[in-house]
Design a protein with these regions (language model features):
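A short, hydrophobic beta-strand-centered structural micro-motif
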Residues: 37-46
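Charged, amphipathic alpha-helical segments and their flanking helix caps
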Residues: 1-25, 47-132
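Short acidic low-complexity segments
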Residues: 27-35
Length: 132
């Protein structure tokens, strides 16, 4: 078992998505116009904060980790169902890491359909990633 880091969480969720949806392109970098669809953008929301212990120090204590995932599809007619299907896979991956879903919203554009989900969990100093 390995230590929980933002990269380990990204790798775990991206691998879970691409194992089920082989045509999805996952990235952790924001690209304004993604060259291929369907795509998912997974990133940690930068406003996480460490939680202090009773002695008010921050060593080996808990911290809040929040992630956002954007699933973007442009298939005419099936964009919504495809995006929601990919998001369900992402939810299952985040749930297996004990994240809870904070919100989900969708945006229907003229050319694309986007589903956005946010997830959060408290991570302790001794937590580790599950074996895949």
């Amino acid at each position: 078992m390995s230590e929980i880091t933002r990269n380990a969480i990204y790798d775990y969720v991206a691998s879970a998505i691409t194992a089920v949806h082989t045509n999805v392109r996952c990235t952790s970098r924001y690209i304004p116009v993604l060259p291929s669809y369907p795509s998912c953008y997974i990133h940690e929301i930068e406003h996480y904060r460490p939680l202090e212990n009773m002695q008010l120090d921050y060593e080996d204590v808990q911290w809040q980790s929040s992630f956002e995932i954007q699933v973007i599809s442009n298939k005419k007619g099936t964009a919504a169902s495809e995006a929601y299907s990919i998001m369900e896979t992402a939810k299952a991956a985040f749930n297996s890491l004990y994240f809870r879903e904070l919100s989900e919203t969708s945006i229907e554009g003229t050319e694309t359909f986007t589903v956005i989900g946010r997830f959060r969990r408290t991570i302790g100093g001794g937590d580790s990633m599950p074996k895949s």
